[in-house]
Amino acid sequence: SQGLVLPIGTFQFPWFSHVNVKEGHDLTEELGVQKWELPLSPQLAGKAKGNFPSFLKKTDQERIQNCYKEMKRDHADKLFEGSIKLDGSSMTVYLKDDVFGVCSRNLDLQETEDNTFWKVARKNKFEEMLRAYGKNVAIQGELMGPGIQGNRENLPDHEFFLFDVWDIDGQNYYTSLESGDFVADCRDSGYKLETVPYVSMIRIMEFSLEDILKKSDVKSLNHPVAEGIVYRSMEDSSVSFKAINNKFLLQEK
């Protein structure tokens, strides 16, 4: 999601002026900007059972360039935990009122033999794991491997890397400590549950915007250039942002 800087005079719209358009104004709809994403393979796209469930929350973070002032104003002294932003495909697995489901970023998917999301869920016994845990929860993470975003990490098989646990009944994310306990419980029960790599902790009051962006220049799982770092508040995981590695953006041009 890169942009192009142009002088205001370039835009031939009557409403586009210094008076009507201020810093931070979202011009997506006015300019007709649309996001283009690589088309998914049939094994990833799957067959839809329905739209992404309303009782879940989609995974998304604001870029730090768009929210640094607000973060420093409202959360300056809070401790944020940083994890590697993996370049894969968003995957959500849930158990609600005895119903088990698997979702891509936008869809609740039917189980079919060739769907990669469901195959990974079955391989890792996620249904048994969530039933053993005994609560209405969803796990959200990155699906990585062959055929996904060019498989930058050069993984031989498809793997799931957890980054969030969503409490369906409470409609909130687990805190970092609660997520850690969840992962430990699942592993102690014999289930395989990989997490995204954790890298550092910061307090926003101690870093400038430029410093936070520089910290995103790190290695990924296997690739020398990570996509970036996602930071989540240790107190409230719904407070989060991402810092994208400029080296990654240059490679993606």
Outline where the language-model segments fall.
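Core nucleotide-handling region used for phosphoryl-transfer chemistry
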Residues: 1-253
